[in-house]
Amino acid sequence: MASADRQMIGDATLAYDPRAKQKAAAKLARIPIKVEPGERLKKPDWIRVKAASPGTRFDDIKRILREHRLHTVCEEASCPNIGECFGKGTATFMIMGDKCTRRCPFCDVGHGRPDPLDQDEPMNLARTVAALALEYVVITSVDRDDLRDGGSGHFVDCIQSIRKLSPQTRIEILVPDFRGRDDRALAILQAAPPDVMNHNLETAPRLYPQARPGSDYRFSLNLLKKFKALHPTVPTKSGIMVGLGETDEEILQVMRDMRAHGIEMLTIGQYLAPSSSHLPVRRYVHPDDFRMFEQEAYRMGFSHAAVGAMVRSSYHADRQAQAAGLHVNAPK
């Protein structure tokens, strides 16, 4: 095997199989930047993860997902809120497989050569949403740079299938940046626009080369601005992680940039490193600072800001949308 097909992980040299799903060290071994480990910070008292309580729907949700061959970002990205969300019968569905074409060193979703799209996935997803009687659904995806439309057509198929079986269900999509395909993707999404359009900026532009290699801060901002121009009544949303080495002023500037590009809903949460191979946590932001970000968000004119250590983009997304003025029926 050629040397280009081998990678170093620690002191071992392993064969590289692009078809296999790579996680942690295996995933990050081939990125052009070096992840520099930092001092391991002690987790403060205000970082608390809620486990699933006995008698909740946690096991039922996992069983239904496996039966319908569905993935969730909750599982694939090792979200700390999975116990609480699954326990309450909610999940963020991740479509188009579990292998991402990007290798962002903050993210725990696996990397690899993606499998062909599952043509049954939209209807399997719709049946699952109907079976769980979900009133609000968040659909996200891995990056699919291998697809000519970036996967936008598959998003449309999923939205249309859900609306066919569950016409009252509100749908939020958390999309990738459709790098180089944004105009085509936005044109395709016009066939079935979501109820909320979400795309995360993730961090300050200074940190993009380290945190989001292959992505562009201005490109991401303009994706949401272009969508808003096409669908002025659909709320746009974006999220930021803190703790990657940014300053408070950089976060405030990202928020100003969001508002300048018409973004109405905001999430800010604490970055927690999935493993020692990922980007290290550079700081734990104090609750008082989160409150400051929240106050500033409303001063800037955001319709809703979910801000706190354990906040994630789709955490209590139904409540976020409702607080922003989108009508969401009470859960059945």
Curated annotation (Swiss-Prot):
Q: Which Gene3D superfamilies match?
A: Aldolase class I
Q: Which CDD domains match?
A: Radical_SAM
Disulfide bridge positions per record: none
According to the record, cofactor stoichiometry and binding are noted as: Binds 2 [4Fe-4S] clusters per subunit. One cluster is coordinated with 3 cysteines and an exchangeable S-adenosyl-L-methionine.
Q: Where in the cell is it found?
A: Cytoplasm
UniProt keyword list:
4Fe-4S, Cytoplasm, Iron, Iron-sulfur, Metal-binding, S-adenosyl-L-methionine, Transferase
For this protein, the record's PROSITE patterns field holds: RADICAL_SAM
Reactions the enzyme catalyzes: [[Fe-S] cluster scaffold protein carrying a second [4Fe-4S](2+) cluster] + N(6)-octanoyl-L-lysyl-[protein] + 2 oxidized [2Fe-2S]-[ferredoxin] + 2 S-adenosyl-L-methionine + 4 H(+) = [[Fe-S] cluster scaffold protein] + N(6)-[(R)-dihydrolipoyl]-L-lysyl-[protein] + 4 Fe(3+) + 2 hydrogen sulfide + 2 5'-deoxyadenosine + 2 L-methionine + 2 reduced [2Fe-2S]-[ferredoxin]
Give the top-level enzyme category: transferase
Q: In which pathway does it act?
A: Protein modification; protein lipoylation via endogenous pathway; protein N(6)-(lipoyl)lysine from octanoyl-[acyl-carrier-protein]: step 2/2
Protein name per the record: Lipoyl synthase
Q: Show the taxonomic lineage.
A: Bacteria, Pseudomonadati, Pseudomonadota, Betaproteobacteria, Burkholderiales
